[in-house]
């Protein structure tokens, strides 16, 4: 056998470099990754709904029910429940922020945006009908209207959250239907059962099944 050349024993074999991928292929790969991320985000559910916050809303609603029942003034009755609505929104946002932070979840995610945009229209209609009923002295309709529209909003928003949330919305719609046709003497009981009892019951379920 012929002896090998010394250079061939010392110098490593140099392989040709792989040609870079064309820019079109890189752009297509980035588009595919972006599509996958957006699809996964759209299919995700919003799990930061706080069961403890929902229960706290139920407790404040019971306090509002007692205060409203003790007042003999119609404007005060409406004012108490308007304050309760604002307080409930604040409690809900704050407790969701705490739960999202504790679980390392983004609060303003794609499912969260869908929840807001699904929940807001029925609430806006409820505010408008409150003004109409107050103007025309149809305050006996307000408990039923409030719970029906709140239930519609919860059902619509709950499709992007955990499964128990839409069920809670249906329960509010059921109590709202009863309140709409019930005699005026049932107003306090319906408000306590709906905004108080249902929030407490479903809040406990959410806290137990979905981590707080």
Q: For the regions a protein language model found, what residue spans apply to each?
A:
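Helical transmembrane-bundle signal
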Residues: 58-68, 88-92, 123-127, 147-150, ...
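Terminal transmembrane helical module of multi-pass membrane proteins
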Residues: 156-212
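Hydrophobic core segments of alpha-helical transmembrane domains in multi-pass membrane proteins
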Residues: 80-86, 143-149, 190-198
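Cytosol/matrix-facing amphipathic helices and coiled-coil assembly/linker segments
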Residues: 12-57
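Membrane-proximal helix-loop-helix units in multi-pass membrane proteins
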Residues: 107-111, 115-168
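Selected alpha-helical membrane-embedding segments in polytopic membrane proteins
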Residues: 44-132
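C-terminal ends of transmembrane helices
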Residues: 41-42, 92-110, 152-160, 202-210
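Membrane-helix interface and helix-disruption motif detector
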Residues: 73-79, 133-141, 183-188
């Amino acid at each position: 056998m012929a002896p090998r050349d010394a250079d061939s024993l010392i110098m490593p074999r140099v392989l040709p470099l792989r040609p870079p991928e064309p820019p079109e292929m890189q752009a297509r790969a980035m588009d595919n990754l972006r599509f996958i991320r957006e699809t996964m985000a759209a299919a995700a559910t919003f799990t930061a709904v706080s069961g403890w916050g929902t229960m706290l809303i139920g407790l404040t609603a019971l306090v509002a029910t007692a205060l409203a029942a003790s007042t003999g003034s119609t404007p005060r009755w409406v004012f108490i429940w308007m304050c309760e609505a604002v307080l409930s929104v604040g409690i809900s946002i704050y407790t969701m922020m705490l739960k999202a932070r504790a679980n390392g979840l983004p609060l303003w995610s794609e499912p969260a945006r869908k929840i807001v945009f699904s929940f807001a229209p029925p609430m806006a209609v409820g505010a408008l009908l409150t003004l109409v009923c107050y103007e025309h002295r149809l305050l006996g309709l307000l408990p039923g209207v409030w719970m029906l529209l709140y239930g519609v909003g919860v059902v619509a928003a709950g499709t992007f959250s955990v499964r128990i949330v839409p069920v809670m919305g249906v329960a509010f719609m059921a109590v709202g239907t009863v309140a709409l046709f019930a005699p005026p003497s049932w107003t306090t009981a319906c408000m306590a059962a709906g905004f108080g009892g249902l929030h407490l019951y479903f809040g406990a379920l959410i806290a137990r099944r979905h981590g707080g």
